[in-house]
Structures are given as C-alpha cells and as structure tokens.
Amino acid sequence: MTSNTPNQEPVSYPIFTVRWVAVHTLAVPTIFFLGAIAAMQFIQR
C-alpha cells in the first residue's frame, strides 16, 4: 500500500458505513453493560 494516488482517498472510506453501524450497534451496548455490571459489583446490600 504505497502512495500511488496521493491526492485521492481510498474509494470506499466514508465514516458512516454499514460496517460502522454494525460495529457500534454491538459495541455501544456492550460497553454500557460492562460498565453497569462493574458498577453493580460495588453496590452494598
């Protein structure tokens, strides 16, 4: 991957892609639940 086209970005390289949506629909609730479960460990009964 040398810079043979220096002015041009890679063709399919937008920020919001189907892959971005698929990653974040899994990653955002996962991080949320990990933080929630970690916080539950410190709740005193």
UniProtKB/Swiss-Prot annotation:
<dbReference type="Pfam" id="PF00283">
    <property type="entry name" value="Cytochrom_B559"/>
</dbReference>
<keyword id="KW-1133">Transmembrane helix</keyword>
<feature type="topological domain" description="Cytoplasmic">
    <location>
        <begin position="2"/>
        <end position="17"/>
    </location>
</feature>
<dbReference type="GO" id="GO:0009539">
    <property type="term" value="C:photosystem II reaction center"/>
</dbReference>
<dbReference type="GO" id="GO:0020037">
    <property type="term" value="F:heme binding"/>
</dbReference>
<keyword id="KW-0472">Membrane</keyword>
<keyword id="KW-0813">Transport</keyword>
<keyword id="KW-0249">Electron transport</keyword>
<dbReference type="GO" id="GO:0009767">
    <property type="term" value="P:photosynthetic electron transport chain"/>
</dbReference>
<dbReference type="GO" id="GO:0009055">
    <property type="term" value="F:electron transfer activity"/>
</dbReference>
<protein>
    <recommendedName>
        <fullName>Cytochrome b559 subunit beta</fullName>
    </recommendedName>
</protein>
<keyword id="KW-0604">Photosystem II</keyword>
<keyword id="KW-0349">Heme</keyword>
<dbReference type="GO" id="GO:0031676">
    <property type="term" value="C:plasma membrane-derived thylakoid membrane"/>
</dbReference>
<dbReference type="InterPro" id="IPR013081">
    <property type="entry name" value="PSII_cyt_b559_N"/>
</dbReference>
<dbReference type="InterPro" id="IPR006241">
    <property type="entry name" value="PSII_cyt_b559_bsu"/>
</dbReference>
<feature type="modified residue" description="N-acetylthreonine">
    <location>
        <position position="2"/>
    </location>
</feature>
<feature type="binding site" description="axial binding residue">
    <location>
        <position position="24"/>
    </location>
    <ligand>
        <name>heme</name>
    </ligand>
</feature>
<keyword id="KW-0007">Acetylation</keyword>
<comment type="similarity">
    <text>Belongs to the PsbE/PsbF family.</text>
</comment>
<keyword id="KW-0812">Transmembrane</keyword>
<comment type="subunit">
    <text>Heterodimer of an alpha subunit and a beta subunit. PSII is composed of 1 copy each of membrane proteins PsbA, PsbB, PsbC, PsbD, PsbE, PsbF, PsbH, PsbI, PsbJ, PsbK, PsbL, PsbM, PsbT, PsbX, PsbY, PsbZ, Psb30/Ycf12, peripheral proteins PsbO, CyanoQ (PsbQ), PsbU, PsbV and a large number of cofactors. It forms dimeric complexes. Part of a photosystem II (PSII) assembly intermediate complex PSII-I; crystallized from a strain deleted of psbJ, it forms monomeric PSII before addition of the oxygen evolving complex. PSII-I includes 3 assembly factors not found in mature PSII (Psb27, Psb28 and Psb34).</text>
</comment>
<feature type="topological domain" description="Lumenal">
    <location>
        <begin position="43"/>
        <end position="45"/>
    </location>
</feature>
<feature type="transmembrane region" description="Helical">
    <location>
        <begin position="18"/>
        <end position="42"/>
    </location>
</feature>
<dbReference type="GO" id="GO:0005506">
    <property type="term" value="F:iron ion binding"/>
</dbReference>
<keyword id="KW-0602">Photosynthesis</keyword>
<dbReference type="InterPro" id="IPR006216">
    <property type="entry name" value="PSII_cyt_b559_CS"/>
</dbReference>
<keyword id="KW-0408">Iron</keyword>
<keyword id="KW-0793">Thylakoid</keyword>
<keyword id="KW-0479">Metal-binding</keyword>
<comment type="function">
    <text>This b-type cytochrome is tightly associated with the reaction center of photosystem II (PSII). PSII is a light-driven water:plastoquinone oxidoreductase that uses light energy to abstract electrons from H(2)O, generating O(2) and a proton gradient subsequently used for ATP formation. It consists of a core antenna complex that captures photons, and an electron transfer chain that converts photonic excitation into a charge separation.</text>
</comment>
